[in-house]
Amino acid sequence: MSQQVIIFDTTLRDGEQALQASLSAKEKLQIALALERMGVDVMEVGFPVSSPGDFESVQTIARIIKNSRVCALARCVEKDIDVAAQALKVADAFRIHTFIATSPMHIATKLRSTLDEVIERAVYMVKRARNYTDDVEFSCEDAGRTPVNDLARVVEAAINAGARTINIPDTVGYTMPFEFARIISGLYERVPNIDNAIISVHTHDDLGLAVGNSLAAVHAGARQVEGAMNGIGERAGNCALEEVIMAIKVRKDIMNVHTNINHHEIWRTSQTVSQICNMPIPTNKAIVGSGAFAHSSGIHQDGVLKNRENYEIMTPESIGLNQVQLNLTSRSGRAAVKHRMEEMGYQESDYNLDRLYDAFLKLADKKGQVFDYDLEALAFINKQQEEPEHFRLDYFSVQSGSSDIATASVKLACGEETKAEAANGNGPVDAIYQAINRITGYDVELVKYDLNAKGQGKDALGQVDIVVNHHGRRFHGVGLATDIVESSAKAMVHVLNNIWRAAEVEKELQRKAHNKENNKEIV
């Protein structure tokens, strides 16, 4: 019988570090729920000591997620471990993941320490983490550039201290697959107590070898793989989990291991991460790219028509990609929309049917037929706009031409008030943004603007994603409409609501901190 490979997802921790704009607590929870539905064994959801906001996000996810083990990162620092435990303690069961560098370069230049001191510190911190939970993971940062004999000493000491998972990261994506396999094999040969822990790997893609290194490590005995959906992460990214998962499934003949992942949720989880993180998936991306199952060569097309297995080593359906596209019209009822969402794998908790159906009817009136990709786009926007809105777009109009200065008029609901402004700009989008900024008074700098068609044809929905800089912090906004000017306006209103909500959250955190200090004084 094949052994299980544990899937450890770090999309919300290592993956988020690569984003241009930080995710809100709601967005993180949305991704966490998608990962839970896909069946990841462990999800690393943040670094609680880094900020009050991260602490709150970790705590919220730990409270809600039940079917995956929630994990938080901590340096080999007492405060890090204590704060991680505080954030996680609301979970039924949790993992603390602590780490310290072990390579000669990092020890000498970053830590200004010695290997013996590193081992002593690692042992102390693993024991401290064990005071809070039996599930402690220890990572040897930059293990790929650590001599295997040194690595073996650290690993043996960490296991003796109580670590139940030992992670071997290729932190800078330096090693080759045959080298990495040799490191894992070398640890099995040198560490006498290695059977008391699960060996994990965490690889980066600086040389394009993250997935290859992870698979080589699994073949050599590793039984946990860490990575992120779509491979997002620091620099060139992390190991793409969907690629490792499907490689293990497709090549079970030689890997002789399995995962407990629900493969049919891979496509939707990938899309969720891509949209929320504002990181488009390349067309030629393995497994989840839009061209992953496309056949343009005549020879290939002929072969696929005769037998799909001639040129397809897996099916789109195996990752949950339904290629049968049905269309609905304005005559389709709520029940039909709900039924189609269920057929596409959506649960009622994934969207608000009333709001979705209202948006569906408006779109159907505009373009006649509404396709699956339209419904999915509407459901995504529906989810993003569930939170309370301080600003709401009531009305806009734009006048522009080839030789005219663009002029926009905008009416916004701002809390209980309604305000209107007009402005000129360098094109219709800029004019609308100038008018909106006049109304709100927010000082924002547009740093990124992306427009993507959600579907096919001239009447396709256009999704606009923007990133703005506000007082040194970046925020993401998204808008969806058949009119790209309207999409752009909605994206700016969305980003301003995100800024407003972040300010409200900050006020609440300050209030809690103030109350906590007052309670200390009373005691």
UniProtKB/Swiss-Prot annotation:
One cellular component (GO) term of this entry: cytosol
Give me the disulphide-bonded residues.
none
Task: Note the InterPro entries from the entry.
Answer: 2-IPM_HCS-like, 2-isopropylmalate_synth_dimer, AIPM/Hcit_synth_CS, Aldolase_TIM, LeuA/HCS_post-cat, LeuA_allosteric_dom_sf, LeuA_bact_synth, PYR_CT
- Name the predominant localization: cytoplasm
User: What is the main EC category here?
Assistant: transferase
Q: Keywords in UniProt for this one?
A: Amino-acid biosynthesis, Branched-chain amino acid biosynthesis, Cytoplasm, Leucine biosynthesis, Manganese, Metal-binding, Transferase
Q: Which GO terms describe its biological process?
A: L-leucine biosynthetic process
- Role: Catalyzes the condensation of the acetyl group of acetyl-CoA with 3-methyl-2-oxobutanoate (2-ketoisovalerate) to form 3-carboxy-3-hydroxy-4-methylpentanoate (2-isopropylmalate).
- Tell me what this protein is called: 2-isopropylmalate synthase
Lineage of producing organism? Bacteria, Pseudomonadati, Pseudomonadota, Gammaproteobacteria, Enterobacterales
